[in-house]
Amino acid sequence: MNQYARTELLLGAEGMSRLHGARVALYGVGGVGGHAAEALVRSGVHQIDLYDNDTVSLTNLNRQLIATRSTIGMYKVDAMADRLRDIDPEVLVGAYRMFYMP
């Protein structure tokens, strides 16, 4: 059994394969983006690119998954990349310390 067995029951093998083959980019991994990144990887997305130039601060502790006393001062993309790899060691995470401005 693998960690995505329950998701595969819902999506089927073809759906799971499509999800596993998806590549997702998230711009901002704080409050909303952090929850989205974690949900995507827990669902089976295998490649994710994270863009954020901010660092974890004390004021993030009340609302952000990546914010703990041990991550204060870390770049948010690095803290999130560590967290996502802890959930699935095979996930491919691109962590980009930059703001995206269209």
Give a label for each model feature.
Residues M1-A25:
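N-terminal charged helix/coil linker that caps or initiates catalytic domains
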Residues L10-E14, A37, P102:
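A generic local structural motif
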Residues H20-R42, Q47-D52:
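Glycine-rich adenosine-cofactor-binding loop
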Residues V24, L65-T68, Y96:
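Conserved short-loop catalytic and cofactor-binding motifs
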Residues V45-D88:
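Glycine-rich phosphate-binding loop and adjoining beta1-alpha1-beta2 segment
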Residues L92-G94:
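Conserved beta-strand segments of alpha/beta enzyme cores
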Residues Y96-P102:
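Conserved SAM/SAH-binding loop
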